């Protein structure tokens, strides 16, 4: 059996890894071993943070809605607001409610008054 020296294949594989790591800083973009390690770390982080992003945005929307609902009324909170929303069968998700609360507070007040009464 003939000996395979892997010249072309190895170069092509390393070039692919270098292109991925070209924006990394220092040895992380130049040395082959560290680029492969950093590539693995980057892929793991991106996979983890794709699911974390959904959590973070939901938390941000809830915080914004809670802040606006507590502004006017003394004993009114986010949990009561959402409970009344479901009770009245109004189909507005948290993202839309947060956008309304930020951009058009009058509209949000109309919605909350409609829910309470």
Curated annotation (Swiss-Prot):
The record lists the organism as Phalaenopsis aphrodite subsp. formosana (Moth orchid)
Q: Name one GO molecular function term.
A: rRNA binding
CDD domains named in the record: Ribosomal_L20
Query: What protein name is recorded for this chain?
Result: Large ribosomal subunit protein bL20c
Keyword S-adenosyl-L-methionine applies: no
Q: What is its main location?
A: plastid
| Family classification | Belongs to the bacterial ribosomal protein bL20 family.
Gene expressing this chain: rpl20
For biological process, the GO terms are:
ribosomal large subunit assembly; translation
Q: Specify the superkingdom.
A: Eukaryota
Q: Pfam families, per this entry?
A: Ribosomal_L20
Keywords noted in UniProt: Chloroplast, Plastid, Ribonucleoprotein, Ribosomal protein, RNA-binding, rRNA-binding
Q: Where in the cell is it found?
A: Plastid, Chloroplast
Q: What does this protein do?
A: Binds directly to 23S ribosomal RNA and is necessary for the in vitro assembly process of the 50S ribosomal subunit. It is not involved in the protein synthesizing functions of that subunit.
The answer to whether the entry has keyword Plastid is: yes
Gene3D superfamilies registered for this protein in UniProt: 6.10.160.10, Ribosomal protein L20
**Native organism taxonomy:** Eukaryota, Viridiplantae, Streptophyta, Embryophyta, Tracheophyta
Q: Per the record, GO CC terms?
A: chloroplast; ribonucleoprotein complex; ribosome
